[in-house]
């Protein structure tokens, strides 16, 4: 009898631990629940270790994610190599089939909340191989310094210097890339860095080669308003909750947990920077269907001292949605994927609107049954569907 009760209690506790609310139209929910449970377990262990003072939360999660790392092994379709671009590690994928013309080039930036991730992760290695083979393109997948060891602007600067190196005529010639067909792409935090470096590279007089396209996959684009409708509506959905998103943002700037606490309350933007809120005012930038009866409330003013200590969240290099229209107007053809069940959905939607308002050619794919991270999760139907949409657009436009 005692064993039966113990077993019953154990089953209930396990079920409670793994349960997450999922919308009815999410495909293959048990695969998502399993993946989310593994991430949740790793996160809880990391939190426990941090509570005991054993290790920083993100350092522990990085250790757990090491199982994702795969070697730069060439296959029957693609030659894979590793090198440095201006002291930044990159992994390069070159199709093996003969080409009589110069190939297009894609510079890819991985996600991971500026704290996790690597070009060597299985999910990014797989995507880069598929991209190189499918598009007959040279793919450069870049790494960059990660928090908590490094904070903004290190991540931006690493990616910027790496891309700038790639855009030299002699480097493109070395890898057989057509200088008229170079694009940049990234997912999540990589989408953030994609938008940021694309804006800044336009203003660099020493960079003569222009990017043809940029592709942003569920990008994080602003850290001023942490209570947009998608953050309220999707706050507990996998694989990125609102609390984890805010932890990533705050770690990007500092290990000082005071910033995280202020961001959780949406009370971190001081009055002195309130003029920037016009660029992220979802009440004027979101289509009506995504507002769903939410009422806009200006974020409660925060501490000027906090903003002065950690100015990154008011810097356009960290938050590309803060760029002036005069900058956005000159951006290249843009592709943006947003997902309905993603806390970052509204960042992407607002950027679509702002780019369209300034005359940029934008293709926007909204995945009605999509969620954060779906582009690179192995073995899911939605992953293949999203990758095909993404690669089809690149094939047509790059």
Swiss-Prot record:
Record localization: Endoplasmic reticulum membrane; Microsome membrane
Keyword annotations from UniProtKB, A to Z: Disulfide bond, Endoplasmic reticulum, Glycoprotein, Hydrolase, Lipid metabolism, Membrane, Microsome, Signal-anchor, Transmembrane, Transmembrane helix
UniProt KW Manganese keyword: no
Disulfide pattern: 115-339
Major enzyme class: hydrolase
Pfam families referenced in this protein's UniProt entry, alphabetically: Abhydrolase_3
GO molecular function, one term: triacylglycerol lipase activity
Protein name per its UniProtKB record: Arylacetamide deacetylase
